Each structure stands twice: as structure tokens, then as C-alpha cells.
UniProtKB/Swiss-Prot annotation:
The gene is ytxB. Belongs to the TVP38/TMEM64 family. Pfam families: VTT_dom. Its main location: membrane. This is TVP38/TMEM64 family membrane protein YtxB. One of its GO terms (cellular component) is plasma membrane. It comes from Bacillus subtilis (strain 168). It is a multi-pass membrane protein. The chain crosses the membrane at residues 9-29, 34-54, 58-78, 81-101, 159-179, 181-201. Keywords: Cell membrane, Membrane, Transmembrane, Transmembrane helix.
Amino acid sequence: MKRKTAVKWLAVLAGAGLLYWGNKTYLNVSPKEIRVWVLSFGVFAPLMFIGISIVRPLVLFPVSVISIAGGLAFGPLLGTLYTLFGSMCASAVSFFAAGLFSAKKNGHYERLEAIQKQMEDNGFFYIFLLRILPINFDFVSYAAGLSNVKALPYFAATAVGIIPGTIALNVLGASFLAGNLPAFFMVLALYIVFISLPFIFRKKMQNLFQESN
């Protein structure tokens, strides 16, 4: 790795570390606190919620907290719809920001080369699996932005892949307020399906890894 590239990545890591520290120190808020703040905007609450969802990846704020807050603030149906829309916008921000920063057409980055190759070779299916797996949402978005993966399969895979987790977290958030036991078991069932999918597609995943080696 060239010295200039190494310095750039050290700066990125330092910036990420600073953002993480600031997040934990100043943005360590709960879903209930987000709910109260968002609903204070009245009829503009949905717009504010979508707005913070869009800027969230820029400050490395956990997507799970936002998703639960969506269920708390708007209920399982509207909360899920607003969270899905906000998450798609956030994934676009991360994807294009990473692409602009890295000048992605000029090559690969050693640390991410295996993931980049998988994304480029297998497109929709690989990104879909990464979205299904309990992997950091923004890591997948930034990794895709650093690769040569096309925008259409990236967004299509993201839209489909985030549905199970988004529904589960929003229903969980809504059940906190309602004290709804059936909703809790519904979330539990969704999570069982959610974590089982990688095992169901295990053979396909192994084939993908073998093809890239």
C-alpha cells in the first residue's frame, strides 16, 4: 500500500474513532428519548424521523436504535414504512459518499478486497445475504461504495434484505408501549427466521466463496 493511501486510511480510521467517541459521549440516547424528541415536531414528526435516519450513518449511530424508536413513535406499520424509507436513503448516502471519497473505479483496497470481489461478482445475492446477516448496516453500505458494484442490484438487495429486521425491530418498539405479549412472540419468530436464512442458503454461500477463490 502506498504511503499516501496509508495516510488517507489512517485519517479515515481516526475520524471514525472520533465519531464513535462523540456518539457514545454525546449521542448516547435511548429509543424512548428519540420518540419524545421526534413527536415534539407534531405533524412534521415523520419528516424529522426520516431526516435523522438519513444523517445517521454519517455519525455512526446504531440503526437498531432508530428502528426501535420508529415503532415506539409511529407503531408497527407506519414505523416500519418510515424506517424502511429512511434506511434506503441512508444506504444511498453511505454508498455514494464512499464512492466519491475513494474514487472507486481506480482499484481495490486490500482490507476489503475479498468482500469487494464478492459484491462485484455476485451482485444482488451477496449483498442480500449481507443485509440478512446481523452485520453492521453501514459497513455493508460503505464496502459496497468502495467496490465496483452497480447501484441497481445494491439498492434492490438492500430493499429486500432489510425488511425482516426492520419489521422485527419496529414491532418490538411498538410492543414496549402496548405491553403486547403476542407481538413479542411475533418478533421472536421473525428473528428466528431472520437468523436461519443464512443456514438455509448455506450451500449457495459456500459456492459463492469457492467461485471467488
